Structures are given as C-alpha cells and as structure tokens.
C-alpha cells in the first residue's frame, strides 16, 4: 500500500534529519534544540474547508508521542508545535513567523498545500529554516535550487 510506505519513508527521513541535526549539535544547539528537547513546527488545516487534512497532523503528533515514549531521539524528546492555519495563506504566514521567531523551532515539518507553502517558502529560505516534507502537488517545489 503506497500510503503506508510513504508514511514509513517520511518517518525515517524525519528521524534521519533530526538525528543528524542533534548529533552535530553538541553544546552549540542552535534554534529548537536543547539537551532534552527538539522543537519542530507545523501549520495544517484543523478547521476550514480542508479540515479533513487535520488527520495528518494528529497522526504525526501521535507518531512523535510514540517516539518520545521510546526515549526520543538521542535522548531528546520531539516537541511538535502544530497550529491550525485553516488552509489560509495569511494565517500560515502568521503562524510560521510565530513558530520561527517566538517558538524558535528547528524546522517546519509537513506543511500542507500549494497556496500555503507558496506563501512561506521565501520567508523560510531567508531565515534559513528547513522546511521538511512540504505537502504539495505543485511541480515547482521539485526544484532544489529554487526551493532548497
């Protein structure tokens, strides 16, 4: 089943990125990483016309809870800060800025939608904040030079 495979692939990729980021962090952790925690941010539509996709955010939160129950990643708990953007690009921008500037997340994880991802990619690139597993059907996000 393709959905199950892609979820496993996504989970492995997330863990690999987080392990790589935390393994090299030592005492100079950088944004979102401490000796005990890794903060990652997400905006996803829990309300509005595409609220059915909120299930993705709830499933991902449950996955990170399972990882944390097993000791986390390199002894650090993963803290997913997931905010409702109602599939509204202005709300996505507002929440993404909060996640980066106030919550100091390591990365933005699995943001959903072409219009919402289009609204935040330049900001994230300028702030040098990784955007991991942006969910979009747009081919434009397949160009790593323009969308690193």
What is each stretch, according to the model?
Residues 28-36, 41-61, 83-89, 112-113:
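Extracytoplasmic "Venus flytrap"
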Residues 35, 104-148:
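Extracytoplasmic ligand/sensor domains, especially the bilobed periplasmic-binding protein
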Residues 44-47, 63-64, 68-71, 100-103, ...:
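Sec/Tat-exported extracytoplasmic proteins
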Residues 55-69, 91, 131:
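Short, solvent-exposed amphipathic alpha-helices that sit
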Residues 71-87:
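Short helix-loop-beta-strand segments that form the rim/entrance of peptidase-like active sites
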Residues 86-106:
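Short, well-structured alpha-helical segments in soluble
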């Amino acid at each position: 089943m393709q959905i199950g495979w892609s979820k496993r692939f996504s989970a492995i990729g997330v863990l690999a990125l987080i392990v790589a980021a935390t393994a090299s962090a030592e005492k100079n952790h950088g944004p979102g990483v401490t000796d005990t925690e890794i903060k990652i941010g997400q905006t996803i539509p829990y309300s509005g016309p595409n609220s059915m996709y909120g299930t993705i955010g709830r499933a991902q939160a449950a996955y990170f809870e399972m990882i944390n129950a097993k000791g986390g990643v390199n002894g650090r708990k993963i803290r997913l800060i997931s905010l409702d953007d109602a599939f509204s690009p202005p709300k996505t921008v507002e929440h993404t800025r909060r996640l980066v500037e106030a919550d100091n997340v390591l990365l933005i994880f699995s943001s959903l939608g072409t219009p919402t991802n289009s609204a935040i990619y330049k900001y994230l690139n300028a702030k040098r904040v990784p955007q991991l597993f942006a969910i979009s059907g747009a081919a434009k996000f397949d160009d790593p030079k323009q969308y690193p």
